[in-house]
């Protein structure tokens, strides 16, 4: 009963900046209940994020999703009518690229969470593998989350929405957003003509390109889904050594520059 009450009544507030620490998918459709067993729902400080289950003890999300009193729910589809196999966890440890937990819009927006106890695999809970090859521009990607489905007005759905978008050349994002450096550890993804995008409430969730987990929802334009204003995603492949090192117990491993 406590779990049902929490899932049904938690409020979703928007961050005061353009980062998608509460983003939903614009222009998508309801995800199939069986297509996202790795997708986790993260609540903190009255905000929400997404995340990805890597194994029974570890979740990968965005650094800007860090907050107090974090709760992590696995096996969720409908927030109003929870699956019977929903599980709740809290962080045991959090790991960031920088010990000061700093990040920018183009670097280090990534956080590994070790759960307080292992997750039990079930019909709606299963991990997603890390990528075996780097992302390729032009790939069709799947983005998903419980973020708002309208922008700038916010409408939050009961179930996660999914949308297919394209992995774009990084220069498209540089043209859209002043201040992005010539190179970064991010990916640029969206639809050039607009209409589909991750948005407020989707942050931390996965970007899956050609079947591989390549990105973490980070930030984008405001309003969301505008023409030639794609979303910016943390590049998972670029951080593989750091992710694998932390999970293996090597806390001295460093993130790529």
From Swiss-Prot:
Alphabetical UniProt keywords: Disulfide bond, Fibrinogenolytic toxin, Hemostasis impairing toxin, Hydrolase, Protease, Secreted, Serine protease, Signal, Toxin, Zymogen
EC number: 3.4.21.-
Residue ranges of domain Peptidase S1 in the record: 25-248
Expression sites by tissue: Expressed by the venom gland.
Domain of life: Eukaryota
Any one GO BP annotation for this protein: proteolysis
Removed propeptide positions: 19-24
GO molecular function: serine-type endopeptidase activity; toxin activity
Active site per the UniProt annotation: 64, 109, 203
Intracellular or extracellular location(s): Secreted
InterPro entries for this protein: Peptidase_S1_PA, Peptidase_S1_PA_chymotrypsin, Peptidase_S1A, Trypsin_dom, TRYPSIN_HIS, TRYPSIN_SER
SUPFAM superfamilies xrefs: Trypsin-like serine proteases (SSF50494)
Signal peptide feature range: 1-18
Disulphide bonds in the chain: 31-162, 49-65, 97-255, 141-209, 173-188, 199-224
Main location as per UniProt: secreted
An annotated GO cellular component: secretory granule
Subunit-structure text: Monomer.
Further remark: Negative results: does not have activity on gamma-chains of fibrinogen (FGG).
Family: Belongs to the peptidase S1 family. Snake venom subfamily.
Main function: Snake venom serine protease with fibrinogenolytic activities. Cleaves beta-chain of fibrinogen (FGB) efficiently and shows relatively lower activity on alpha-chain.
Protein name per its UniProtKB record: Beta-fibrinogenase mucrofibrase-3
Taxonomy of the source species: Eukaryota, Metazoa, Chordata, Craniata, Vertebrata
